[in-house]
Amino acid sequence: VNFVSGIKSCITVPDDLKDGLFMAEEYISGQEYSIESISFNDRHDIIQITEKVTTGAPHFVELEHHQPAHLSPSIEKKIRNIIPPILSSVNFSNGASHIEIKVNDQGDVYLIEVNPRGGGDYISNDLVSLSTDYDYLKQMILVALGEYNPVAVHHVAYAGIYFLSAYTKRLLPYFNIPLANWMVRRERKTGELTVSSSNYDRDGFIIYCSDKKIVL
């Protein structure tokens, strides 16, 4: 995968690959979000919206997740209105889903990908249960058992996660102080910090929960 922003960043294709297939896609700029949903018998319930921070091109390593996302009422309404039709259009009927989108400065919403699973990076198994009164994992099991009944979801706190890597070395002091009251959990690998090129080579994390968004 190559990120091309102009003529100077174009690449030369080797002769032995010139008969191959290539795909060029527009790069969508804007703020990234993920929508955590659950579906049962073609009904789609949005549980939470996660605001995401990444390294950007070319690797888009995820550095932060925050719930609930900071959105204007109109943008949140737009997101909540488009997600059910997206899931229905791909015939997704039952189970958890994790949908990634971007919203540009004009308020346009772009679909990035649809995942037929709960969100990783502690989104499904930690952040949702911290930021809402909704037991996401329990509801996934009830869907599998055919016993799911929709329940109201209420915002109860701000929750998020910061990932440690060479990109976020500013976080290091928070691993060397006593556990603060807003810290739910923290872990760190030993050794030098990694210049991460994927979500699989980060060096640690801090999960928080508070009555406000924690900015580190």
Residue ranges and their predicted role:
Residues E26-E32, E36-F92, A96, N115-A144:
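ATP-dependent carboxylate/phosphate-activation module, predominantly the ATP-grasp catalytic core
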Residues S93-D105:
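A short glycine-rich, hydrophobically flanked beta-strand micro-motif that places a catalytic Asp/Glu
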Residues D19:
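His/Asp/Glu-rich metal-coordinating catalytic cores
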Residues Q139-L216:
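Peripheral (often C-terminal) accessory segments that flank ATP-dependent C-N-forming ligase machineries
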